[in-house]
């Protein structure tokens, strides 16, 4: 694995402020056809990541590329991520649009039409289509997340979550809830997690 900063690598723009301009690594499979894989990284004038370009053997192919857009406050407005789809083709697995009230996200929509093919894929699942999918308390702590089935989060005096209640993972059945309890020391170190 190699990281590149001030050097241009596979068409990346050199970065002189500490950002990574590119990464590559070696991969082999049964036919040894993949050789090297990597990413190039692009940033805006505020040093925010705006795009990752996926490469195989030094050639861009967008199979696992990502792009980001931001508002003037630095909040993510959109995120588009490519990957391997259930159909066996490569395409968009996330096409997210974020809506805010102040600087707090209240809704995320996903326009992607197909899910990734691999189990455990880290992509957004748009389980809710509500006007307000995320709520917060007066301190800015998240209270609910409709897309993840989080129905309530209780916080301690340090603003650390002490109880998270969720709908069942099995299609968020209303009659089945899971709860996670957290115990902390006086300085905020998490001591225990209990699942019920």
Residue ranges with predicted function:
Residues 1-196:
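Acidic/glycine-rich beta-solenoid
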């Amino acid at each position: 694995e190699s990281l590149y900063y001030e050097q241009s690598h596979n068409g990346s723009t050199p970065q002189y402020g500490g950002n990574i301009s590119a990464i590559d690594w070696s991969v082999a499979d049964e036919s040894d056809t993949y050789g090297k894989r990597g990413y190039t990284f692009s940033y805006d004038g505020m040093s925010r990541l705006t795009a990752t370009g996926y490469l195989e053997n030094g050639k861009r192919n967008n199979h696992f590329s990502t792009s980001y857009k931001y508002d003037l406050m630095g909040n993510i407005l959109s995120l588009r991520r490519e990957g391997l789809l259930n159909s066996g083709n490569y395409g968009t697995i996330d096409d997210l649009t974020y809506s805010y009230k102040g600087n707090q996200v209240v809704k995320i929509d996903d326009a992607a039409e197909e899910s990734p093919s691999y189990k455990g894929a880290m992509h957004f699942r748009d389980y809710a289509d509500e006007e307000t999918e995320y709520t917060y308390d007066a301190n800015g702590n998240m209270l609910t997340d409709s897309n993840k089935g989080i129905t309530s989060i209780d916080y301690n005096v340090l603003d650390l979550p002490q109880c998270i209640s969720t709908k069942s993972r099995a299609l968020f059945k209303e009659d089945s809830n899971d709860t996670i309890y957290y115990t902390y020391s006086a300085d905020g170190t998490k001591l225990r997690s209990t699942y019920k």
